[in-house]
Amino acid sequence: MEAIKVHIGKTVALMNDNIDTDQIIPKSFLKRIERTGFGEFLFDSWRYLPNRKPNPDFPLNAPDRQEATILITGDNFGCGSSREHAAWALLDYRFRVIIAGSYSDIFYMNCTKNGVLPIVLPREAREKLAKITAEEKVTIDLPKQQVISSVGTYPFEIDATWKNKFINGLDDIAITFEHIDAIKAYEQKVDSI
């Protein structure tokens, strides 16, 4: 997992509430287990017209928002069925940070396990962030737990374990390997019994 200590990026806002995992990545695109190749299908039914041409009215298709790495969105983001592919699609598209009012518990965990930092901020803060220009950048300072922008600085909470994983770029496998000597010692002990 790629570490996030301080992330500086451009934003795009999709302020709908209750965006479910089927809207994030439709089930028709879940026919493989690789973690890449899903970005082109992110928000597919909204991003594309029936003829598969980009919908010019969809925020992610705006020419001046193509470099966005921070998604600002509504409440209850990632609700619906559990699918890790939703986090994969967001990351593959290039989003490193999602700022929402709340998340489905399973979706939140899928994001943290796959290197997408889910931040919770109140609606007032998100509405201000949603109005910044496409040229402006927002700073996510994870050690200080702050979202820093031209419209304000907003503190956020994150579990200390997840914070450590993001700052050090540790996924579950990397954490397991941190304890490899103890694992090997245990296996030798069990094998000798």
Curated annotation (Swiss-Prot):
Keywords for this protein: Amino-acid biosynthesis, Branched-chain amino acid biosynthesis, Leucine biosynthesis, Lyase
Molecular-function GO term, any one: 3-isopropylmalate dehydratase activity
Domain of life of the source: Bacteria
Cross-referenced InterPro entries: 3-IsopropMal_deHydase_ssu (IPR004431), Aconitase/3IPM_dehydase_swvl (IPR015928), AconitaseA/IPMdHydase_ssu_swvl (IPR000573), IPMI_Swivel (IPR033940), LeuD (IPR050075)
GO biological process: L-leucine biosynthetic process
One Pfam short name: Aconitase_C
CDD domains: IPMI_Swivel (cd01577)
Xref: PANTHER family: 3-ISOPROPYLMALATE DEHYDRATASE SMALL SUBUNIT, 3-ISOPROPYLMALATE DEHYDRATASE SMALL SUBUNIT 2-RELATED-RELATED
HAMAP family on file: LeuD_type1
Subunit-level organization: Heterodimer of LeuC and LeuD.
Name of this chain's protein: 3-isopropylmalate dehydratase small subunit
Organism: Listeria innocua serovar 6a (strain ATCC BAA-680 / CLIP 11262)
